[in-house]
Amino acid sequence: SCLVGQGAYATILNDWIVVTSGRDRCQLFDKKTGRFIRSVGHVGEDPEGYSDVHGGWQNPYTGQLSFHGWKNEIVVYGADGRFDHIWTPSVSADEFPAMGVFDYLDADLIAGYYSATDSLPARIALFRGDEIVRVESLPVGQEGDKAITPDDIVSISVLKDGGDGLAFIKYKDGRSAIYPLGNSCFWHAGKDLYFRQSYNDTIYRVSAAKELQPVRVLDLGVYSWSYNERFEDKKDAIYPTKFM
C-alpha cells in the first residue's frame, strides 16, 4: 500500500502486473512474485509526460503502454520504462462530452471509438500509425451530445478512485449526466477485440478484415434507458457503466 496508494487498478501485461492508482503512478510488478519492478512514465507537461495514468491501454504484442497525453496526443512507453514515441490519432474527437477512446487490435492496429455528436454519428476507426485504415459508422440510430459550455453547468464532480473514472455533471436546466472518462466499451477475449456502446444491447467483434460483426445481443430489460431519460435524476436507478 505504501507503493501503490488508494484507488488502485490492476491489469496484466505479459509477465507483469500493471497498477495505476490515485497517486498518478503507473507501476509494474512481477506477475509470479509480486515484486515491484519499476515505474513507467510520469504525469507532467514536459515532452515525455502524460496527462493521466487512467484511461490508457497496454499492448501485449508490443509490450508497450499507452497513456493520454495533451492536445489529443497518446504518449507511448515501453515496459522497460523508456519513453518510446508520441502518437496523434488522425481522427480527433469533438469537444466534451464527445470522446475518443482507444485499444489495441494487434501489434500494428489501434481501434478508436468516437461517440456521437449533434453533427456526426458514433464511429469506429482503425489506425496503423498515421494511416487511417477504416472509419465505420455504428449501424444503430442514435442521438448525439452537443458540446458543453461553462454557462450550461452548475457543478462538475470527478471520481477517479480506481479504473478510468467518471464525471458527474449537473446542468442549469435541471438535467444531470454521468460520463465515463476512459475505455468502457472495448475489451479482449483471447485474440479477439469486442466492443459495446454504452446503453446499446449489441456486442460487436472488431476485425481488420471485416466490418463490425454483431456476436451477442443483451437483454437489457429494465436497464434499457431512452436518450432523454439518461439526463433525469433517479434515486432508484443504477447507472449501467459496463456490461461484461
Tell me the role of every PLM-derived stretch.
Residues G7-T11, H54-Y61, G100-A107, S115-A116, ...:
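Structural signature of eukaryotic scaffold interfaces centered on beta-propeller domains
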Residues C2-V4, G49-V53, E95-P97, Y179-P180:
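Short loop/turn positions that demarcate and connect the beta-strands within blades
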Residues R35-K71, W87-E95:
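Blade-loop segments of beta-propeller domains
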Residues S1, R25-V43, E73-V91, P121-A177, ...:
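Surface-exposed loop/turn elements that mediate protein-protein interactions on large endomembrane-trafficking
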Residues I74-V75, H85-Y113:
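Long, hydrophobic, well-ordered secondary-structure blocks that form the structural core
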Residues L13-S21, G63-G69, V75, A107-S119, ...:
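Short beta-strand elements that form the blades of beta-propeller/WD-repeat-like
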Residues S1-R25, H54-G55:
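Beta-strand-rich domains and repeat architectures in extracellular enzymes and scaffolds
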